[in-house]
Amino acid sequence: MVENGGDIYLDCKRDLRVEVHAGQSSLSGKIILMIRSDRMPLGVCTSSGTVGHSFSYGRADAVCVLSVSAALADAAATRIGNLVKSAKDIERGLKTAEEILPGIRGVVIICGSHMGLAGDVELAG
């Protein structure tokens, strides 16, 4: 496992859980991704317009993208995050993610108290 500021590369022999940090969103820390060992290696990359120092055109609290390519996951999270300026834009972000499929496996978008999912995303119970 390698982590660098919201970007994670996973390659483990056991299942892992990844918590999505979404800043001040009421959903922050409540969304846990289940990453099965048979789905790795996997890049899990998060972009935010409200958390951290990186510039974003959007205001999503978290856009988390899963892909076999960590570089693609990072780029897709940034692209989708730039589109989400309010909760009303979550659907637009999901449609953009679906255009990138199957290059990415899935996406989680959190904006305020709203969330959207697309693709192969398993939430831990």
Where are these regions (language model features)?
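Conserved mixed alpha/beta catalytic, RNA-binding, or beta-rich assembly cores of soluble enzyme
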Residues: 1-89
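Alpha/propeptide regions of enzymes that mature by internal proteolysis
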Residues: 2, 66-113, 117, 121, ...
